[in-house]
Regions:
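Catalytic core of pol beta-like nucleotidyltransferases
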Residues: 1-24, 32-38, 49-129
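Conserved binding/catalytic microenvironments
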Residues: 41
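Helix-adjacent hinge/juxtasegments
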Residues: 44-48
Length: 129
């Protein structure tokens, strides 16, 4: 399946996740950056405050074997996502600088972007897709 078809299916997946309580679904990794290959999976950050404490249960709640690519979800609460932004964690930096909001509330990403700066001290605000 071509990139546009995969992206459409991922947006549908994200819409279903938001309908089930997720606040935002963000595509990160090679599919978001555009340097994907035929073997790339879909790295997804799902922000939801309605998730189990157990990380494995969180992931299994958002698996979908019907998608044309393997999905690697990272499921975080809003508090966890913002804490990771404050810590400058790579995955959150990637979400802010290269990520594609598939569906959900862009304000969460904007809030996290306030904590991040480039090495030269300047900051970049996420403007959305």
């Amino acid at each position: 399946m071509e990139y546009e078809g995969v992206l459409k299916r991922l947006v549908d997946y994200a819409e279903r996740a938001v309908a089930r309580g997720a606040k935002a679904v963000i595509l990160v990794g090679s599919l978001a950056r555009g340097d994907y290959t035929a073997f790339s999976d879909a790295d997804i950050i799902i922000i939801s405050d309605e998730v189990p404490e157990n990380p494995i249960r969180r992931i299994s709640d958002f698996m979908d074997p019907s998608l044309p690519v393997d999905v690697e979800p990272l499921v975080l609460t809003t508090e966890e996502f913002l804490k990771m932004a404050k810590e400058g964690r790579r995955i959150v930096r990637e979400a802010i600088f290269y990520g594609k909001l598939l569906f959900g509330d862009p304000e969460i990403i904007k809030a996290a972007s306030r904590y991040l700066e480039f090495e030269d001290g300047s900051s970049e605000r996420w403007e959305g897709e």
